[in-house]
Amino acid sequence: MPPGPWESCFWVGGLLLWLSVGSSGDAPPTPQPNCADFQSANLFEGTDLKVQFLLFVPSNPSCGQLVEGSSDLQNSGFNATLGTKLIIHGFRVLGTKPSWIDKFIRTLLLATNANVIAVDWIYGSTGVYFSAVKNVIKLSLEISLFLNKLLVLGVSESSIHIIGVSLGAHVGGMVGQLFGGQLGQITGLDPAGPEYTRASVEERLDAGDALFVEAIHTDTDNLGIRIPVGHVDYFVNGGQDQPGCPTFFYAGYSYLICDHMRAVHLYISALENSCPLMAFPCASYKAFLAGRCLDCFNPFLLSCPRIGLVEQGGVKIEPLPKEVKVYLLTTSSAPYCMHHSLVEFHLKELRNKDTNIEVTFLSSNVTSSSKITIPKQQRYGKGIIAHATPQCQINQVKFKFQSSNRVWKKDRTTIIGKFCTALLPVNDREKMVCLPEPVNLQASVTVSRDLNLACV
C-alpha cells in the first residue's frame, strides 16, 4: 500500500516526540546483573522484525529474564501452574522502550500471582506505521510458536491472557485466532484504528479470538478503532476526548498520544485501586448521558462489566454476547473512578418550551454537574451525573433553571418540581430518593438543598 496521510501523521508524531523528550529526561534504569531489557532501535533501522520474550515473576518483578527456547523456560522462574499474562506493545515511533511498561509489569505482579511475559518487538514496530502493520502476521506466528512451548510445559490454553496495546491488540487477536479462539482472554487497550477499522475479522481483534475478549476504547476519533471488537467494549467518556488530555495541537506529542494511552493508564489504575471502573450497556453515549440506560439487565442479567482482572469482566452469563458497547465516565487523573447517579426533575406543571436545569452535587469542596432537559409538554426529564466521591458523602445539591430569553431581558419565569436521584445501577424505582419538599426555581437563580443519602 502506498504511503498515505497516516504515515505522514506518524512521522510528524515522531518529530514531535523527539522535540519534546528526545533530548532530555531521565536515563532509563540500569538493568540488574543477569537481567535483560528491551531493545532500542531508531527511525532508520527499526523496521526489520526481531523479537524478544522477557519473563517477569512474582519473586523478582523488576528483573526480566530472556526466554527463547524450552530450556530457557525450564531454567527460569516460570511456573506452569500459574496463569500467564502476555503484554504486547504497539507501534513505536522512535524505537524506544514503552514508558509505561515497567509500571504495568510491577502492577500486574502485585495484583495477581502469575507469570508475566513482555513481548519486545521494538525492532519491527519502529519507523513507519505501515511497516509495523506488515510485521503483524510474522510477529503473531512467532508468538504462537513461543506459546506452544508453554503448552508443552503443561500450561493450559485457558490460563493464557494476552494484553495488547494499540497495534499489539490486533497482534493478540491474530495469535488467538491461530489457537482457534481457545486462549483464556484477550484485553485490547485502545486497539489501533488505522488499517483496521475496515479490516475483516480475520485481520483484526475480534470476539472469536479468545474465550473472553474485551477492549477499552479511549481515542476512537484518532488513533484508536471506533468499532466494537470484543465481547465487551468499554467506550470510556464516549471513547474519545479524555478529561485532562490536551485539546490543542500546540501541546505537541501529548496532544497526539494522550487519549490513546489513557486506556493503558486506566487499566493500570484498575489493578492498583479497589474503586470499580464499572460500565453500563447502552446504544450510544448520548443515550447513556440522557439517563436511558440505568442497569445491566440487558444483556448481562444485572452483572455490570468492570475494567480490571475480574473474570470475564464481571459478566456472569453464558453464552457471552458479542460486541456489546458499554459506557462509563472517569476523572482526569488516577484512580479515574467515578460513581454514576441518575438525576430526575418532575415538573408540577407542563410548559410550552423545553426546560433546562443544571444540577450540581457538592461534597468536601468537590463539585459534579449535569444538565437535565425536559422537552416541552412533558412532565419530567433525567440525566446522568458522575461524581468521584460516593453518593452518600454528597451533602448538597444545587439547581439552576437556565433561561432561554435574551441576555438583556430579565427572565422572571419560575418553575416548581420534585427532584429525585439514585445510584446506578437502578434496577427498580424503590432505589430512588427524592427531596422531601418541592423545589422552586427562578430563571438564572441558583438554589441549594441539603441532600441526605444513606450509605449502603
Swiss-Prot record:
What subcellular compartments does it reside in?
Secreted
- Disulphide bridges in this chain? C245-C258, C282-C293, C296-C304
Q: Does the keyword Disulfide bond apply?
A: yes
Q: Where is the active site?
A: S166, D190, H260
Q: Where is the signal peptide?
A: 1-25
Q: Name one GO cellular component term.
A: acrosomal membrane
What family does the Swiss-Prot or TrEMBL record give for this protein? Belongs to the AB hydrolase superfamily. Lipase family.
Q: What does this protein do, in the record's words? A: Hydrolyzes the ester bond of the acyl group attached at the sn-1 position of phosphatidylserines (phospholipase A1 activity) and 1-acyl-2-lysophosphatidylserines (lysophospholipase activity) in the pathway of phosphatidylserines acyl chain remodeling. Cleaves phosphatidylserines exposed on the outer leaflet of the plasma membrane of apoptotic cells producing 2-acyl-1-lysophosphatidylserines, which in turn enhance mast cell activation and histamine production.
Known glycosylation sites = N365
Instruction: Name it.
Output: Phospholipase A1 member A
For molecular function, the Gene Ontology terms on record are: phospholipase A1 activity
| UniProt xrefs under PANTHER family | LIPASE, PHOSPHOLIPASE A1 MEMBER A
Gene3D superfamilies on file: alpha/beta hydrolase (3.40.50.1820)
Catalytic activity line of the entry: a 1,2-diacyl-sn-glycero-3-phospho-L-serine + H2O = a 2-acyl-sn-glycero-3-phospho-L-serine + a fatty acid + H(+); 1,2-di-(9Z)-octadecenoyl-sn-glycero-3-phospho-L-serine + H2O = 2-(9Z-octadecenoyl)-sn-glycero-3-phospho-L-serine + (9Z)-octadecenoate + H(+); 1-hexadecanoyl-2-(5Z,8Z,11Z,14Z-eicosatetraenoyl)-sn-glycero-3-phospho-L-serine + H2O = 2-(5Z,8Z,11Z,14Z)-eicosatetraenoyl-sn-glycero-3-phospho-L-serine + hexadecanoate + H(+); a 1-acyl-sn-glycero-3-phospho-L-serine + H2O = sn-glycero-3-phospho-L-serine + a fatty acid + H(+)
The Gene Ontology biological process annotation of the record reads: lipid catabolic process
What are its E.C. numbers?
Answer: 3.1.1.111
InterPro entries (alphabetical): AB_hydrolase_fold, Lipase, Lipase_LIPH, Lipase_N, TAG_lipase
Principal localization reads secreted
Coiled-coil blocks: none
- Record-linked Pfam families: Lipase
Q: Which UniProt keywords apply?
A: Disulfide bond, Glycoprotein, Hydrolase, Lipid degradation, Lipid metabolism, Secreted, Signal
